[in-house]
């Protein structure tokens, strides 16, 4: 399963113990965590509180490690968006410095990789494509900071599936959904009934050896949607 880093880091000790115990009893492994930072915890602009970031991230990494997580996803569009009239380039560089100087050390300490998630421009102006994420990852000089491909954000940003091949082995995680608005939701659990063609996305993930893919989307009927989604997920084998 993939949990929420922000939620795990913000839990009371009692709530975390309950989560840990429930997972242990179920036998389900928490392999990844997304939703890295709350929107108000900025890594760009003039009001970056590095002390608060450090404490929050350390607590989250420590807890995610206990849950068994191997990968943390850095989306957090509001946290890394352009702020305070800063130029886009400066906000991009601030984001890279944050990853290099604050996050990379925790990745090494807890043996957890971080995947930079390119987001569509409606959610952030900083890192919108796989290429931009690759450049950011390389600038951190960390062997544990890599890239994620999300089918919804790729379509929204016009990021061609072929660009997955250019990322190569640096692509360590992926998100899948039915990436078309259904009215109430902008993306939902994948389902063959929608007739969406995942073949190129799936084939390219396989070609680069992407080790993990998870569902990121909304559902109004979790149990039945999960069963239907399994038919799509099996194609990644």
Which residues make up each language-model segment?
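Short N-terminal signal/transit or membrane-insertion segments
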Residues: 1-11, 102-106, 145, 149
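Structural motif corresponding to the early beta-alpha repeats
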Residues: 2-94, 185, 211-212, 219-220
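Histidine-acidic metal/acid-base catalytic patches
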Residues: 54, 68-69, 127-149, 155-237
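Active-site loop signature of alpha/beta-hydrolase-fold enzymes
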Residues: 38, 121, 154, 181-182
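Conserved beta-strand positions
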Residues: 1-3, 74, 116, 149, ...
């Amino acid at each position: 399963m993939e949990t929420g880093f922000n939620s795990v880091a913000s839990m009371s000790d009692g709530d975390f113990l309950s989560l840990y115990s429930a997972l242990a009893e179920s036998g389900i492994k928490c392999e990844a965590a997304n939703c890295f930072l709350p929107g108000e915890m900025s890594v760009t602009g003039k009001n970056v509180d590095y002390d608060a970031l450090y404490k929050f991230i350390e607590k989250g990494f420590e807890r995610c490690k206990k849950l068994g997580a191997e990968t943390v996803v850095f989306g957090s569009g509001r946290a890394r968006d352009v702020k305070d009239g800063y130029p886009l380039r400066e906000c991009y560089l601030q984001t890279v410095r944050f990853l290099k100087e604050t996050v990379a050390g925790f990745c090494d300490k807890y043996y957890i990789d971080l995947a930079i998630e390119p987001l569509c421009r409606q959610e952030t102006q900083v890192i919108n494509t796989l290429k931009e994420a690759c450049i950011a990852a390389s600038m951190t000089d960390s062997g544990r900071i890599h890239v994620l491909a999300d089918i919804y954000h790729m379509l929204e940003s016009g990021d061609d599936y072929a660009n997955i091949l250019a990322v190569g082995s640096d692509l360590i995680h992926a998100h899948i959904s039915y990436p078309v608005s259904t009215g109430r939701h902008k993306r939902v659990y994948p389902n063959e009934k929608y007739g969406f063609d995942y073949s190129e996305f799936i084939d390219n993930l396989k070609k680069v050896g992407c080790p993990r893919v998870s569902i990121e989307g909304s559902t109004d009927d979790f149990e039945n949607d999960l069963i239907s989604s399994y038919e799509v997920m099996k194609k990644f084998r």
